A protein has these predicted regions:
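Cytosolic, long alpha-helical scaffolding segments
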Residues: 1-176
Length: 176
């Protein structure tokens, strides 16, 4: 289901981006131009979240194939981080839908918590490795998952910012 959904997200990303490019070529009020600029970022962030979901599915398949099981503590840590990333995404999508600041403080708090949690989990992962409580393969999968969850939190936070403070489309970046 994850792979099918990611393929659909990629398809929709392409279609929506094409539409936004066409809309951006029209003579529009500045506010609409800025909104379109913000939407480009939202579409990209959603696509990147889909990529991370696919990476998580790949990691889960690899864990099964290699017979790797995380410790209960590692599972709890990943669960906590996952819940925070999902909350940010839910809040950001609600803000996107309603175009309000309702959850911004909570998003920023959760984003800070995720950033701190990533540092803490990566450090505890290194300690488990050095004490032989974790195999290098399991450690690699754990570390990649932690990093991916932190990036999901970043992309979800970007969605809230992009819709509330759209990019200034008056900047010409023709040489990029």
């Amino acid at each position: 289901a994850v792979y099918k959904r990611e393929k659909y997200i990629d398809y929709m990303n392409s279609r929506i981006t094409d539409y936004l490019v066409q809309a951006n070529e029209l003579v529009l009020p500045i506010a609409d131009e800025r909104l379109i600029g913000g939407l480009f970022h939202v579409v990209n962030d959603i696509e990147r979240i889909g990529d991370h979901a696919e990476n998580f599915a790949d990691s889960a398949k690899t864990r099964l194939e290699w017979g790797i099981d995380f410790s209960d503590k590692a599972k709890r840590q990943l669960q906590e981080m996952t819940e925070k990333a999902v909350m940010i995404l839910e809040y950001s999508l609600e803000m996107f839908k309603n175009r309000n600041y309702k959850h911004m403080a909570e998003i920023l708090r959760l984003e800070d918590e995720i950033d701190e949690l990533e540092k803490k989990l990566q450090n505890s992962h290194v300690k488990r490795l050095t004490k032989n409580k974790c195999t290098p393969k399991a450690g690699m999968l754990f570390s990649d998952t932690v990093s991916g969850l932190e990036r999901v939190g970043d992309h979800a936070t970007n969605i809230a910012f992009a819709i509330l403070e759209p990019a200034d489309s008056t900047d010409d970046d023709d040489d990029e």
